[in-house]
Amino acid sequence: MDWTALTLSLHLALWTVAVLLPLSILAGRWLAYGRFRGKGLIEALVMLPLVLPPTVFGFYLLIAFGRNSPVGALWQDLFGGPLVFSFEGLVVASVIFNLPFAIQPAQRGFEAIPVEVREAAATCGLSPWRALWKVDLPLAWPGVMTAMVLTFAHTLGEFGIVLMVGGSIPGETRTIAIAIYDRVQAFDMAGAGTMAAVLVAISFTTIALTSWLSARVGRRLA
């Protein structure tokens, strides 16, 4: 069992969730309530990672984050190291690749809030910011939780993006999915099976726990 790869995968998943949690709330609410020109285009761009093969998407991110790109050069100047083939590069790539898994469920959660509830909040004089925290977010929280669970579970199993942007550097970019692939390549099916089983157990436990929490939140709101 490659515990280093598992720990790195968990760190990557937690960092991705931490970045996308506030982003999914703000972007999901904006897309749910907004009525503006170009909304369909923005939604299509958010959903783009779902239809592109991970290796293709990873290739374009590799080009965008490379040393000769504006983003890569700026990162090199600010932090003194390359963005590609680093853990930080994996986090950035994972955040971009998981945008649809984070934003779409949150958006659906906000869209499910009755218009009458939002109108009542406005009638009571709540500012948009207070309405978000006092009314919208508690009602949309099951959707937000679903978004974070999907993001966490999807990040744990990411392969194509990780391989293209981060490679397989032990202790830096070698995630559990890459470690499983390496074991299969070495015909170590027992080792690969053990790591795959651990990954399934973590994902199942996360989903089960979140379903239980969502049910509790739903009963309280009811």
Regions found by a protein language model. Give the residues of each.
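Membrane-interfacial helix termini and adjacent extracytoplasmic/periplasmic loops
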Residues: G58-V95, V165-P170
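Transmembrane-helix boundary motif in ABC transporter permease subunits
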Residues: W15-V46, F59-L61, G109-E111, V115-V117, ...
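C-terminal transmembrane helix and the adjacent membrane-cytosol boundary/short C-terminal tail
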Residues: G38, P100, Q107-R118, A122-L126, ...
